[in-house]
Amino acid sequence: MKKNILITFLILVSMKAISQENMVTISGGYSFANIEDTDVKGTGWRINGVYEMNPMAGKFAHGIAIGYINLSASETIAQQTVTSTIGSLPVYYAPKVMFGSDKFKIFVKGALGFQYAWLKREALVTIKDTDFGFYGGGGAGLMIFLKENIFINGEYEIAWASNSSYKDGWISTVSGGIGFKF
Protein backbone atom coordinates (compact mmCIF):
# COMPACT_ATOMS: atom_id res chain seq x y z
CA MET A 1 0.00 0.00 0.00
CA LYS A 2 2.80 2.41 0.89
CA LYS A 3 4.44 1.58 -2.41
CA ASN A 4 1.26 2.46 -4.34
CA ILE A 5 0.89 5.76 -2.49
CA LEU A 6 4.54 6.63 -3.20
CA ILE A 7 4.17 5.79 -6.90
CA THR A 8 0.96 7.85 -7.14
CA PHE A 9 2.66 10.77 -5.39
CA LEU A 10 5.67 10.63 -7.75
CA ILE A 11 3.40 10.52 -10.81
CA LEU A 12 1.42 13.54 -9.61
CA VAL A 13 4.61 15.50 -8.86
CA SER A 14 6.06 14.67 -12.28
CA MET A 15 2.82 15.72 -14.00
CA LYS A 16 3.10 19.11 -12.32
CA ALA A 17 6.67 19.46 -13.61
CA ILE A 18 5.56 19.02 -17.24
CA SER A 19 2.28 20.86 -16.99
CA GLN A 20 1.43 24.02 -18.87
CA GLU A 21 -0.07 27.27 -17.74
CA ASN A 22 -2.78 28.97 -19.80
CA MET A 23 -3.60 32.68 -19.99
CA VAL A 24 -6.45 34.65 -21.52
CA THR A 25 -6.10 38.41 -22.07
CA ILE A 26 -8.80 40.84 -23.23
CA SER A 27 -7.54 44.31 -24.16
CA GLY A 28 -8.49 47.47 -25.97
CA GLY A 29 -6.80 50.69 -26.92
CA TYR A 30 -5.86 53.43 -29.34
CA SER A 31 -4.67 52.62 -32.89
CA PHE A 32 -3.14 54.83 -35.56
CA ALA A 33 -1.79 54.36 -39.08
CA ASN A 34 -0.72 56.29 -42.15
CA ILE A 35 -3.35 55.70 -44.82
CA GLU A 36 -1.98 55.57 -48.35
CA ASP A 37 -3.16 58.26 -50.81
CA THR A 38 -3.96 60.68 -47.97
CA ASP A 39 -1.94 63.29 -46.10
CA VAL A 40 -3.54 62.57 -42.73
CA LYS A 41 -3.04 59.89 -40.13
CA GLY A 42 -5.92 57.52 -39.48
CA THR A 43 -6.82 57.11 -35.82
CA GLY A 44 -9.23 54.84 -34.04
CA TRP A 45 -9.57 51.98 -31.62
CA ARG A 46 -8.80 48.28 -31.25
CA ILE A 47 -10.12 45.37 -29.22
CA ASN A 48 -8.12 42.17 -28.93
CA GLY A 49 -8.32 38.73 -27.33
CA VAL A 50 -5.38 36.37 -26.80
CA TYR A 51 -5.27 32.75 -25.61
CA GLU A 52 -1.75 31.70 -24.58
CA MET A 53 -0.14 28.44 -23.56
CA ASN A 54 2.92 28.70 -21.33
CA PRO A 55 4.70 25.30 -21.14
CA MET A 56 6.03 24.52 -17.66
CA ALA A 57 5.26 28.12 -16.61
CA GLY A 58 8.50 29.18 -18.28
CA LYS A 59 9.44 32.41 -19.99
CA PHE A 60 8.18 31.40 -23.46
CA ALA A 61 4.46 31.46 -24.32
CA HIS A 62 2.61 30.61 -27.53
CA GLY A 63 -0.64 32.39 -28.26
CA ILE A 64 -3.44 32.76 -30.76
CA ALA A 65 -4.90 36.27 -31.07
CA ILE A 66 -7.92 37.75 -32.79
CA GLY A 67 -8.92 41.38 -32.79
CA TYR A 68 -10.74 44.19 -34.53
CA ILE A 69 -9.15 47.50 -35.57
CA ASN A 70 -11.22 50.51 -36.69
CA LEU A 71 -9.46 53.56 -38.19
CA SER A 72 -10.81 56.73 -39.80
CA ALA A 73 -9.40 59.93 -41.27
CA SER A 74 -10.83 62.99 -43.03
CA GLU A 75 -9.13 65.50 -45.29
CA THR A 76 -10.23 68.29 -47.61
CA ILE A 77 -9.22 67.99 -51.26
CA ALA A 78 -10.40 70.62 -53.78
CA GLN A 79 -13.11 71.91 -51.43
CA GLN A 80 -14.58 68.50 -50.74
CA THR A 81 -14.11 66.36 -47.65
CA VAL A 82 -12.88 62.82 -48.21
CA THR A 83 -13.47 60.46 -45.29
CA SER A 84 -11.59 57.15 -45.19
CA THR A 85 -12.73 54.37 -42.86
CA ILE A 86 -10.76 51.15 -42.50
CA GLY A 87 -11.67 48.06 -40.51
CA SER A 88 -9.35 45.11 -40.02
CA LEU A 89 -9.85 41.70 -38.41
CA PRO A 90 -6.37 40.26 -37.70
CA VAL A 91 -5.92 36.61 -36.68
CA TYR A 92 -2.37 35.64 -35.79
CA TYR A 93 0.11 33.46 -33.91
CA ALA A 94 1.61 35.48 -31.04
CA PRO A 95 4.82 34.07 -29.52
CA LYS A 96 5.97 35.84 -26.36
CA VAL A 97 9.15 35.94 -24.24
CA MET A 98 8.60 37.10 -20.64
CA PHE A 99 11.08 38.39 -18.05
CA GLY A 100 10.49 39.25 -14.41
CA SER A 101 9.08 38.04 -11.12
CA ASP A 102 5.76 36.54 -10.10
CA LYS A 103 4.31 40.03 -9.47
CA PHE A 104 5.66 41.98 -12.46
CA LYS A 105 6.70 40.81 -15.93
CA ILE A 106 7.85 42.58 -19.07
CA PHE A 107 7.58 40.88 -22.44
CA VAL A 108 8.52 41.02 -26.09
CA LYS A 109 6.10 39.46 -28.56
CA GLY A 110 5.66 38.70 -32.23
CA ALA A 111 2.68 38.57 -34.57
CA LEU A 112 2.41 36.39 -37.66
CA GLY A 113 -0.87 35.74 -39.42
CA PHE A 114 -3.50 37.20 -41.73
CA GLN A 115 -6.09 39.95 -41.71
CA TYR A 116 -9.38 40.60 -43.42
CA ALA A 117 -9.91 44.31 -44.18
CA TRP A 118 -12.73 46.68 -45.17
CA LEU A 119 -12.13 50.04 -46.84
CA LYS A 120 -14.67 52.80 -47.34
CA ARG A 121 -13.91 56.18 -48.97
CA GLU A 122 -16.67 58.79 -48.91
CA ALA A 123 -16.77 62.04 -50.90
CA LEU A 124 -19.09 62.84 -53.83
CA VAL A 125 -18.87 59.13 -54.62
CA THR A 126 -18.62 56.34 -52.04
CA ILE A 127 -16.19 53.50 -52.70
CA LYS A 128 -16.25 50.28 -50.68
CA ASP A 129 -13.89 47.32 -50.91
CA THR A 130 -12.85 44.26 -48.93
CA ASP A 131 -9.56 42.42 -49.02
CA PHE A 132 -7.47 39.73 -47.36
CA GLY A 133 -3.74 39.75 -46.66
CA PHE A 134 -0.70 39.30 -44.44
CA TYR A 135 -0.48 40.60 -40.86
CA GLY A 136 2.88 40.54 -39.06
CA GLY A 137 4.85 42.56 -36.57
CA GLY A 138 5.92 42.73 -32.95
CA GLY A 139 5.55 44.55 -29.71
CA ALA A 140 6.48 44.90 -26.07
CA GLY A 141 4.61 45.34 -22.84
CA LEU A 142 4.18 44.58 -19.18
CA MET A 143 2.01 42.46 -16.93
CA ILE A 144 1.28 43.47 -13.32
CA PHE A 145 -0.23 40.66 -11.26
CA LEU A 146 -2.99 41.77 -8.89
CA LYS A 147 -3.39 38.21 -7.60
CA GLU A 148 -1.64 34.98 -8.51
CA ASN A 149 -4.06 34.41 -11.40
CA ILE A 150 -5.28 37.94 -12.34
CA PHE A 151 -3.16 40.58 -14.05
CA ILE A 152 -3.43 43.88 -15.88
CA ASN A 153 -1.68 44.18 -19.20
CA GLY A 154 -0.23 47.17 -21.05
CA GLU A 155 1.45 46.92 -24.45
CA TYR A 156 2.52 48.56 -27.68
CA GLU A 157 2.25 46.68 -30.99
CA ILE A 158 3.32 47.64 -34.50
CA ALA A 159 2.31 45.43 -37.42
CA TRP A 160 2.47 45.46 -41.21
CA ALA A 161 -0.90 44.81 -42.84
CA SER A 162 -0.76 44.03 -46.55
CA ASN A 163 -3.60 43.44 -48.93
CA SER A 164 -3.67 41.75 -52.31
CA SER A 165 -5.32 44.49 -54.35
CA TYR A 166 -5.23 47.85 -52.60
CA LYS A 167 -3.39 49.42 -49.62
CA ASP A 168 -0.56 48.21 -47.37
CA GLY A 169 0.67 49.92 -44.23
CA TRP A 170 1.91 49.96 -40.66
CA ILE A 171 -0.67 49.90 -37.86
CA SER A 172 0.40 50.89 -34.34
CA THR A 173 -1.60 50.19 -31.19
CA VAL A 174 -1.23 51.22 -27.56
CA SER A 175 -3.54 49.11 -25.40
CA GLY A 176 -4.37 47.94 -21.92
CA GLY A 177 -6.44 45.11 -20.58
CA ILE A 178 -7.02 42.40 -18.04
CA GLY A 179 -5.85 38.81 -18.07
CA PHE A 180 -6.45 35.56 -16.25
CA LYS A 181 -3.99 32.74 -15.67
CA PHE A 182 -5.24 29.20 -15.11
List each model region and its residues.
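Short, positively charged, low-complexity/disordered linker segments
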Residues: 123-152
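Gram-negative (and chloroplast) outer-membrane scaffold detector with strong preference
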Residues: 45-122, 144-150, 179-182
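Hydrophobic secondary-structure block in the mid-to-C-terminal portion of proteins
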Residues: 145-182
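Hydrophobic alpha-helical segments of small multi-pass membrane proteins
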Residues: 91-93, 111-114, 132-142, 156-158
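Flexible, solvent-exposed loop segments that connect beta-strands
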Residues: 23, 30-41, 62, 67-89, ...
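Sec-dependent N-terminal signal peptides
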Residues: 4-13
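Positively charged n-region of N-terminal signal peptides that target proteins for export
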Residues: 1-4, 20
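Sec/Tat signal peptide C-region and signal peptidase I cleavage site
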Residues: 15-19
